[in-house]
Amino acid sequence: MAELATIARPYAEALFKASSSDVAGTSAWLEKMAVIAASPELQQFADNPKATAEQVLGVVAGAFGAPLPAHAQNFLGALLENGRFSVLPEIAKQFRALANAKSGSSDAVVYSAFPIDASALANVAAALEKRFGRKLQVTVQQEPELIGGIRVVVGDEVLDTSVKARLEQMKVALAA
């Protein structure tokens, strides 16, 4: 994992510098390409020595669903030439971190046992922004094993108010 991050960092930084005038647009196509590149079948095809860079680029362009911007084609071509196609999801992650740092925000993942409606999510987001002291881009993932409550992950910080966590704390306290 750390090796992927080390490989991805220079690509993410170079792309960020090259796209400083349109970070949001670049982020949009990069995120979409990262989802496409995460496909195990496409990874296997890209790793095949008989597959040319043009063939892989054609498959990605077809899966993209719209014409790839010229700089996206150039970037993808550079990754394919250097055998770094498999690093694309990590590059997207680091690019998002650079964009967040520039805008002074962070990504937050809220894990919940139950679905959260829009108004409740807005309240949770406001409370979390106050707690963490920065603007957050909140996404929700459902995890029924939490039983109740929420667990929030912002970067390397975790705020766990789930029933599961409290039961674990009680178990440890009773066993001591």
Swiss-Prot record:
State the species of origin: Variovorax paradoxus (strain S110)
Q: Which UniProt keywords apply?
A: ATP synthesis, Cell inner membrane, Cell membrane, CF(1), Hydrogen ion transport, Ion transport, Membrane, Transport
Membrane topology is: Peripheral membrane protein
Q: Which NCBIfam families is this protein grouped with?
A: ATP_synt_delta, PRK05758.2-2
What is the role of this chain?
F(1)F(0) ATP synthase produces ATP from ADP in the presence of a proton or sodium gradient. F-type ATPases consist of two structural domains, F(1) containing the extramembraneous catalytic core and F(0) containing the membrane proton channel, linked together by a central stalk and a peripheral stalk. During catalysis, ATP synthesis in the catalytic domain of F(1) is coupled via a rotary mechanism of the central stalk subunits to proton translocation. This protein is part of the stalk that links CF(0) to CF(1). It either transmits conformational changes from CF(0) to CF(1) or is implicated in proton conduction.
Which family does the UniProt entry place this protein in?
Answer: Belongs to the ATPase delta chain family.
Cellular compartments annotated: Cell inner membrane
**How does the record describe its quaternary structure?**
F-type ATPases have 2 components, F(1) - the catalytic core - and F(0) - the membrane proton channel. F(1) has five subunits: alpha(3), beta(3), gamma(1), delta(1), epsilon(1). F(0) has three main subunits: a(1), b(2) and c(10-14). The alpha and beta chains form an alternating ring which encloses part of the gamma chain. F(1) is attached to F(0) by a central stalk formed by the gamma and epsilon chains, while a peripheral stalk is formed by the delta and b chains.
State the Gene Ontology terms under molecular function: proton-transporting ATP synthase activity, rotational mechanism
Q: Which GO terms describe its cellular component?
A: plasma membrane; proton-transporting ATP synthase complex
- Identify this protein by name: ATP synthase subunit delta
